[in-house]
């Protein structure tokens, strides 16, 4: 009996005894912010300028009790807050690196009157505040940041900071996965509109959905989306395969990955279902038709302008005969493309091809083999799988097919994903396994602990005594932990990153867009896994 078969049987037993997913009622929670000051700044408490008092032990350099009763400890390697009354997951919190401190050498602490702390270090002062806010309040911070610094022709992606750590020096740039990141942001805005009916959400959803649609149009409207593009006069990129449009107005990037097709089709299904604009829905259906026809007409390959398949756009039986470890994922992707296209367009060609691919060609069975042939854990593949699962579980109504193939396949991926406490993957898992016993308090806790500051500061945790390391490195040879640290103590990351790599960052030379927070929040609100604001 294979491991996957055992997982499937265990899942059946679990579902027989489990209740439904447990939604969580959201409440305002303290969110961290910090402001740096020079020691001589008049806003700094005068007592912080006094010589620090010596403590009887060497490891602790300062100690203070905050107005809420929490005890803060300064050390030569950062700051620790201990609150015995807090949820066990939040009882001990670590502050280090430029996300929180001018440097990690804490010398003196002075509490403010609102549960926060003034912190003097070797090189400056940080005022760390704990501001009570709802998750919806938090979304507004991310939304404003995206509008101000991460919108390039409607595409949403990370940006560079010319001066490290200074958002005023922000420069948007093209990204290999502009289509995927923008699709995830646009989908978040679609869910936001469905929940709130906000005109602003509708406008943002339209703008970014149109930007994703244009990626296919700029490359010639032949069903081959560009990875990214720039306009004439913008700085020319130095990497990848780029092509000018015939009119010389745009320069677009080729060698498009399966990542982009997954992202586009995920968005198109969500937008077609949730947005009211009939003209936009027509464009979505036409673009979906061209993309899926391109894949079908080229034998399940994505064919570049070179006439050859792209590096990762391969879903054919010939490719699968080589027994690549990504065949379960790629099978899942193609099935999701076809099912989503059938739903969006109503074209029976795609439904007929879907059934042929699923059963006659055996792709549904191949999709269940993930644990049998997985060579390594690839967190980018997890992202692609879960986005593909969303379309399948949303549009597939055949319970036999769901129970025989797709739910066992989902459980195989979930075996590792469950460790990550990702609210996005929890939402998608719950749509596929509605009887599974999931507590969305875990999802909410991750959202609460995602940092508001998305600058890619250098973060180091490998020295910590509370981190237990795995003996195996990850696929990039990075040391990884068994301990899952809170997101606001980790390097800034998207959902395709390994959350068990505890060191990282680039000294504040870039800023993430923050859409990784918006999509699970609004998806959770839409599906009523997250109740309230």
Predicted regions and their residues:
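Well-ordered alpha-helical scaffold segments within catalytic/enzyme domains
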Residues: 183-198, 248, 263-280, 330-347, ...
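Loop/turn residues immediately N-terminal
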Residues: 76-80, 123-126
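Terminal, non-catalytic domain-edge segments
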Residues: 130-149, 385-533
